[in-house]
Amino acid sequence: TSRTPLIFRDDKYRLAELCLKSFRESLGSLKVKLYALLDNCPQEYEHLLTRHFDDDSLELIRLDGVGNPATLMKQIEILLGQNSSDLVYFAEDDYFYLPNQFREMVEFARSRDDVHFVSPYDHPDYYTRRLHQYPSRVVTFGSRHWRTTGVTNMTFLTKKQVLMEAHRVFKTYTRRNRGILIWLSLTKHKALNPIYAFPYLMHERRTFKKLARSWLSCWRHILFGRRWNLWVPMPSIATHMEKTALAPCVDWIGTIRAEVGPLQELMQETTGANGGRDAM
């Protein structure tokens, strides 16, 4: 969950409600099967899911506080075992989606053989951090440009066959080997080349340590495995709700205001209902 979300900072349920509603609206008329992993979640979250998805399209899976790594392993097991779709989607619960836009991501994934993974999120770090200063391939499709990138978060679309081939890399996910390190390995980001990695040792020690952990955890794939392509849309189809990491070129404040009402009114409502706590 976002550390400092744009809205509902102290109310995870309302944040989840807002994001889930936007996800459902972004799907539009797409027929989906949603496997909801509830890891030690209160029962009210089950009611939230059943309000937005009918019984035929929803399967609730209750877990007893197993944590993120085990939850990811369960997701992989479920999605590789299902036969409903050739495309599978990993969704974190703190993303806000634009309405009726998810279909474009699905169509893009099916339009090209070189589309292996697709994130809905055009991360602002792509434009500011040294780690992302590298050439990208850019294509047009639908109403957007799409570019290749080296890393993303753990919300992404892929083909079942691709997941089958790459799942061993995802299974290296632990509390220390987080998503960024897995993506560096899958896309074989140039920073994993020792020649490019050395400047990080001098100027960005934290990034250098991440690169080193990626090598330690996934060296076999880095050396001998396939390079996979990760694509993101420009402009974004969704944004992470961390208030300092909103996707660029979209009026997220205005869009969210249209969903929940003027933010000032929302702050007053939340403050009154929750004993003076901040809403944003």
Residue positions per predicted region:
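Short loop->beta transition adjacent to catalytic acidic/histidine clusters or analogous donor-positioning motifs
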Residues: 26-35, 58, 86
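Acidic ATP/Mg2+-coordinating residue in the GHKL
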Residues: 39
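Short, acidic, metal-binding catalytic loop of nucleotide-sugar glycosyltransferases
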Residues: 13-31
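Short, flexible/disordered intra-domain loops and linkers
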Residues: 2-14, 169-175
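Active-site-proximal specificity loops/subdomain of glycosyltransferases
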Residues: 42-86
